[in-house]
């Protein structure tokens, strides 16, 4: 029997999301973006995550950290959003795709196009399981992953924020009163 090549174990890399540092150390004297990044490094984080921050790439290089860029995207906006995110030189891009009422078949169609554009830009993208998006329930997420694999032969790259499944089918006003 042929020997299998050893599989490298996964590495856990922790990142601080900038939104967790808003209003710090106080709402009266909030940290600058640089201070937030430096604080994350000081606390032992490997990376920082947030939206399209122009200075992200420079700050991460200076602090020997990586950046995870968050974007929301829809059928008409995904190309522009990916191009803007590319400027942050992210290790990966976390995508919150479409809306809660987007059908899985529609989500897969746009996701396939997004992956193609991301690859041409040299980007790695992950679809985040998130409230008020096409992945807001486990059933929809499973359906999207299944359809993506059927269409491409590849597994869907997912980013799980486990807290969001606790909030499934979150509807914002005026739909929920």
Give the residues covered by each predicted segment.
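Active-site gating/metal-coordination segments in enzymes
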Residues: 81-107
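Charged helix-capping and loop-helix junction motifs
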Residues: 29-32, 104-112, 138-143, 171-176
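Active-site beta-loop-alpha junctions enriched in small/polar residues
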Residues: 17-24, 51-53, 70-74, 97-100, ...
């Amino acid at each position: 029997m042929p020997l299998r090549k050893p599989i490298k174990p996964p590495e856990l890399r922790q990142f601080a999301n900038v939104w967790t540092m808003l209003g710090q150390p106080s709402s009266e004297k909030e940290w600058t973006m640089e201070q937030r990044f430096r604080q994350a490094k000081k606390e032992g984080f490997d990376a920082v995550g947030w939206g399209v921050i122009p200075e992200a790439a420079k700050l991460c290089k200076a602090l020997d950290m990586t950046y995870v860029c968050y974007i929301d995207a829809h059928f008409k906006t995904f190309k522009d959003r990916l191009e803007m995110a590319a400027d942050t030189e992210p290790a990966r891009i976390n995508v919150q795709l479409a809306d809660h009422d987007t059908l899985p078949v529609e989500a897969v169609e746009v996701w396939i196009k997004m992956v193609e554009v991301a690859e041409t830009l040299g980007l790695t993208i992950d679809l985040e399981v998130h409230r008020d998006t096409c992945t807001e329930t486990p059933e929809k997420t499973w359906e999207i992953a299944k359809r993506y694999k059927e269409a491409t032969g590849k597994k869907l790259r997912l980013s799980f924020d486990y807290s969001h499944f606790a909030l499934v089918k979150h509807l914002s006003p005026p739909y929920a009163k």
